[in-house]
């Protein structure tokens, strides 16, 4: 089986691939993430996913399949990146407070012969966030390296009052669609089952 390389430094994506039992090797694939003029959010994330996969492919020897992915938080058509500082993070949380926004995650697979990619859009609804809550959340350190200034799988989960779409896509990798695409490249899931804590019935 052709080895799979993950062109991402995201620990969330590593955890998600491990969750579905797919063995992989992490590689670095830095790319210019600047949006192009008038580029739509779906086109932006899919272009970056493909660019990361292509950049990863040139750094490995022999047959390989490289997975690249990119996630963007979008509010009113505006892409919210990682906050630059405390003020930026608090402004993002204020904008997201009490509203719905979209999270777009694109995934690309590249084996040097073909490149396939897709984009999944999910809608996340936030409850109202007080100024004090936003300040305490920033102090936790979690928002500083997260697109949109929050992590749905972390402390930021308390802000989420609803979600339509793929939870795993919001975290960083839509597992259902990714598993299907991996299968098209001959890479099966459930090769190495992740450890699942035993659940004991308290009754």
UniProtKB/Swiss-Prot annotation:
For whether the record's keyword set contains Cell inner membrane, the answer is no
Membrane-crossing segments per the record? none
SUPFAM superfamilies reported in the protein's UniProt record:
ITPase-like
Indicate where this protein resides in the cell.
Cytoplasm
Q: Which GO terms describe its biological process?
A: nucleotide metabolic process
Active-site residues per Swiss-Prot or TrEMBL entry: 70 (proton acceptor)
Q: Which reaction does it catalyse?
A: dTTP + H2O = dTMP + diphosphate + H(+); UTP + H2O = UMP + diphosphate + H(+)
According to the UniProt entry, what is the EC number of this protein? 3.6.1.9
Q: Which GO terms describe its cellular component?
A: cytoplasm
Which molecular-function annotation in GO is an example for this chain? dTTP diphosphatase activity
Q: Which domain of life is it from?
A: Bacteria
Q: Which InterPro entries match?
A: ITPase-like_fam, Maf-like
Keywords (A to Z) from UniProt = Cytoplasm, Hydrolase, Nucleotide metabolism
Q: Which cofactor does it need?
A: a divalent metal cation
Pfam families cross-referenced by the UniProt entry: Maf
Residues the UniProt record annotates as site (Important for substrate specificity)? 12, 71, 153
Do you know which PANTHER family this protein is assigned to? BIFUNCTIONAL DTTP/UTP PYROPHOSPHATASE/METHYLTRANSFERASE PROTEIN-RELATED, BIFUNCTIONAL DTTP_UTP PYROPHOSPHATASE_METHYLTRANSFERASE PROTEIN-RELATED
**Function of the molecule:** Nucleoside triphosphate pyrophosphatase that hydrolyzes dTTP and UTP. May have a dual role in cell division arrest and in preventing the incorporation of modified nucleotides into cellular nucleic acids.
Fetch the HAMAP family from UniProt: Maf
Task: Report the family membership.
Answer: Belongs to the Maf family. YhdE subfamily.
Q: Which NCBIfam families match?
A: maf (TIGR00172)
Q: What is this protein called?
A: dTTP/UTP pyrophosphatase
